[in-house]
């Protein structure tokens, strides 16, 4: 062999892959214990040689590294706060629509309004509202499992959490001790109640009750001696036994119940058939819930008493609730209610005490319209507020004095007529009180006070010695 050939061999040898291939195959043989897997070992070795590096060789294949990260306390807090903010959206609606904070005492209308809000808030489709044609007591008595079976998919847990939170919140309030007055301003500010000036009056909620003997359920439940405070402040309806709640019928006559149910059924049928889509607002940032509020009010305003029940109140429990919820009796007027209690109007006392009226209507704390009726039926107040002699029309002769007394009743020393008038304006849309056009400080009750109170305007005028007002 020539020198040229030897040099040529030296040049070619380094690129000859035969020996390396033999080592690869030998490696395959050494790694295979079963003769039948000869070719599979060869192919695996070949694939190993041809493998393209991916940069993932150092990545751990431990199963624990593939799990989703657990929720940290921080992320849980963020989610909880987000839900809480969403729930607060309903709280604002509840105050505006006059829905009680205690879901145990909701009627069918309140339950529907809550579900309607949830459907819009969570963009729920094809919600069968007929499944929830029940009052608040029935709703809260379902329990979580039965509730989830009726609720829409995916959001049942959230809705139940919201309902449960409202129940717990009210239960905690009912068990709270006396609340320091210094906390009232911050609470009222959070609830944005200053615009309506329906605020907590701890003194009034626990007012002296010498003049009104307590009989019935509340006397047994509370066992409060005469002359002591009946209930603690910042306290609304408590969770009473189901027997008392189911018999709660003083607020509605059978006819109005049937009418409300028939209207609600018609509304639910329209909702389920998609006929209310025209009511939805197409403008961004405008909630369609508000666009249907007029429709909801059209069938909740069939009874003036129902309307009065819807007026929001941010105070505590009414002074007298002994007969407001014990109600195996047929619906009656306030006049019959007083006579049934053997409490005739005392000389020098208002014919319609606001505390007893609040207990009769079941509205909870004393509301502005009830307070005005108390002043109007008290002869000693005729110097600053009185009937004009024209039906249910009345005049604030001294509006500042009326505002001052309302502020004293509600523990709001800074109350003035401007703030009081904002509360009065709220009643306009509810068809409870209207402003008389062309007359200053003159208003008129436009709801059905005759059926509610059992008195005609002329009867009250005669009892109070009211003469027709000829000044204007």
From Swiss-Prot:
Residues 366-446 bind DNA. GO terms for cellular component: nucleus. Pfam families: Ets, Ets1_N_flank, SAM_PNT. It is found in: Nucleus. Coiled coil: none annotated. The keyword Membrane does not apply. The keyword tRNA processing does not apply. Keywords: DNA-binding, Nucleus, Transcription, Transcription regulation. One of its GO terms (biological process) is cell differentiation. This is Protein c-ets-2-A. The gene is ets2-a.
């Amino acid at each position: 062999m020539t020198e040229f050939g030897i040099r040529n061999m030296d040049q070619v040898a380094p690129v000859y892959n035969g020996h390396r291939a033999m080592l690869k195959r030998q490696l395959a043989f050494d790694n295979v214990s079963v003769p039948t897997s000869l070719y599979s070992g060869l192919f695996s070795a070949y694939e190993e040689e041809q493998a393209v590096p991916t940069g993932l060789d150092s990545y751990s294949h431990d199963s624990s590294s593939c799990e989703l990260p657990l929720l940290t306390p921080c992320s849980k807090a963020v989610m909880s706060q987000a839900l809480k903010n969403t729930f607060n959206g309903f709280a604002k609606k509840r105050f505006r629509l006059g829905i009680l904070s205690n879901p145990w005492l909701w009627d069918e209308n309140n339950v529907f309004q809550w579900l309607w809000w949830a459907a819009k808030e969570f963009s729920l489709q094809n919600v069968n509202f007929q499944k929830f044609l029940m009052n608040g007591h029935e709703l809260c008595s379902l329990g979580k499992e039965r509730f989830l079976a009726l609720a829409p998919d995916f959001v049942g847990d959230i809705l139940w959490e919201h309902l449960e939170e409202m129940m717990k919140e009210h239960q905690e309030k009912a068990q709270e001790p006396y609340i320091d007055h210094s906390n009232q301003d911050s609470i009222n500010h959070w609830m944005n109640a200053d615009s309506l000036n329906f605020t907590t009056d701890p003194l009034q909620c626990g007012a002296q009750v010498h003049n009104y003997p307590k009989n019935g359920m509340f006397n047994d439940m509370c066992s409060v001696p005469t002359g002591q405070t009946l209930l603690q402040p910042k306290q609304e309806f408590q969770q009473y036994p189901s027997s008392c709640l189911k018999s709660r019928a003083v607020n509605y006559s059978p006819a109005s119940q049937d009418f409300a149910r028939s209207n609600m059924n018609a509304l639910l049928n329209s909702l389920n058939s998609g006929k209310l889509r025209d009511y939805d607002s197409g403008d961004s940032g405008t909630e369609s819930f508000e666009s249907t509020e007029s429709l909801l009010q059209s069938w909740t305003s069939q009874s003036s008493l129902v309307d009065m029940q819807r007026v929001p109140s941010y105070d505590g429990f009414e002074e007298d609730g002994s007969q407001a919820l014990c109600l195996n009796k047929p619906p009656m007027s306030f006049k019959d209610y007083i006579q049934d209690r053997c409490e005739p109007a005392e000389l020098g006392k208002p014919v319609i005490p606001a505390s007893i009226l609040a207990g009769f209507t079941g509205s909870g704390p004393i509301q502005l319209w009830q307070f005005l009726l108390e002043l109007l039926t008290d002869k000693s107040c005729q110097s600053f507020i009185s009937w004009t002699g024209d039906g249910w029309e009345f005049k604030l002769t001294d509006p500042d004095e009326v505002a001052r007394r309302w502020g004293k009743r509600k523990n709001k020393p800074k109350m003035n007529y401007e703030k009081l008038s904002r509360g009065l304006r709220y009643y306009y849309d509810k068809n409870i009180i209207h402003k008389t056009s062309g007359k200053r400080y003159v208003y008129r009750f436009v709801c059905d006070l005759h059926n509610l109170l059992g008195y005609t305007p002329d009867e009250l005028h005669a009892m109070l010695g009211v003469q027709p007002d000829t000044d204007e």
